[in-house]
A protein has these predicted regions:
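Basic, glycine-/proline-tolerant helical and adjacent loop/strand elements
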Residues: 65
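Conserved NAD+-utilizing ADP-ribose enzyme module
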Residues: 1-61, 69-141
């Protein structure tokens, strides 16, 4: 697995909280959910050899990790078999939805992959979860 820890100019999206750790997080994480994030850990571009990607991990899928979204987007557009970037986020508090419309606040540490667009407006603040529970929405991460 490879990592690009560089920060290149301004970014539309949050940067990795610790660029030195980009590429060190586990490949197997949760996927989606939680509604709020605390930290961006890295951006990931998953590459699929069965869809034309270079077989760097035999015929198994793999990802390249980035500290910044824009280089990840550029990479995903020029590499065969690559998906658009995902973002690995850390959550210390989040909202679980065990059943549609049933929202449960949770605390702990959770690492999950999100669609990059879910970052917009979903950085957790001291009151985010309480406000969400007053007026829940069924959309987003």
């Amino acid at each position: 697995m490879r990592a690009d820890r560089r920060i290149v100019g301004a970014s539309k999206w949050p940067l990795a909280i610790d660029p030195a750790k980009v590429g060190t997080y586990p490949a197997d994480t949760k996927s989606g959910a939680g509604y709020f994030y605390d930290d961006v850990l890295e951006y990931r571009v998953w590459v699929h050899p069965d869809k034309g990607g270079e077989p760097l991990n035999g015929d198994h899928d793999y990802f390249i990790a980035f500290a910044q979204c824009e280089p990840a987007e550029e990479y995903s557009k020029r590499i065969a078999g690559a998906e658009p970037p995902l973002v690995l986020v850390r959550q210390f508090e989040w909202v679980d939805e065990p059943n549609r419309g049933q929202f449960v606040p949770e605390k702990g540490e959770r690492i999950t992959e999100w669609q990059v667009g879910w970052l917009q407006g979903n950085k957790r603040t001291a009151t985010s979860i309480q406000e969400f529970l007053k007026h829940p929405i069924e959309a987003g991460p």
